[in-house]
Amino acid sequence: MIYKLRNWILKLMKLTGKIALVTGGSRGIGFAIAKILSENGALVVITSKDSEKIKKAEAQITNSFGITCDIKKKSEVQNVLNQTIEKFGKLDILVNNAGIFPKIKQLHEIDEEEWNEVLDVNLTGQFRFTKEAIPHLQKTSGCIINISSDAGLKAYQGFNADAYSASKAALIVLTKCWALEYAKEKIRVNCICPGVVDTDMTKPFLKNQKDIEFMNNEHPLGRIGQPEEIGKAALYFTSDDASWVTGAVLTVDGGESIK
């Protein structure tokens, strides 16, 4: 009876024995993804520039290990992969989640430094992590999840964040490129496009009840999303349930992008 119960529990925990790396995993969507992967048996490495936020996340996520990292620095990205392999011996899952959101400005108001910083973090940073992770994922037939945005799918009236939208659109195309490039090696690459989710990044848009009601009404399902809902989508892509899924772009946005 105990043996059967143990096997049943292990079956429910879809990621037992897996090593996952979640960039930007100390808060928001990244934290929710790291937490749900851990709850399903994975050992999760999380990265953040902020060491204090990493400590707080480690305290809340079972079987997690935090590493400080500036995604704009190649040497720090390499250090994350080196530490992960040295400590755990392999890598099964990479979640490219780290990102920044610029101030809302029209194109003529954006200076080149702002533009470059957004692309360096949101796009080139994902390239850096994926490039360093691929040799390890080749050994495990692992998977990659890119966290894009529905802002990468279409333009929104009044949403003047061109660099952000450009970086997220490019990540969608890269998902398909990488899925084709590494399909023969059984590495699956998929993408999630969240809508407006209740995180620190979206708080500037949700300053009062009027803002919240407006944003809720922008989504056909009548509300903004919760980080855990993106986490559940990520869990699907990392599990064997998605063993025949690669190059997919999943919108988790309450219907916002179909308007």
Description of each model-found segment:
Residues 5-8, 16, 101-104, 235, ...:
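Short C-terminal tail/terminal secondary-structure segment
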Residues 135, 176, 180-184, 243:
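Alpha-helical segment proximal to the catalytic Tyr-Lys
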Residues 191, 213-241, 245, 254:
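C-terminal helical subdomain
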Residues 105-107, 111-119, 215:
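Substrate-binding pocket helix/loop in short-chain dehydrogenase/reductase
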Residues 19, 26-27:
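Conserved glycine-rich cofactor-binding loop
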Residues 149:
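Residue(s) in the substrate-gating loop at a strand-loop-helix junction
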Residues 130, 167, 175:
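Active-site helix of classical SDR
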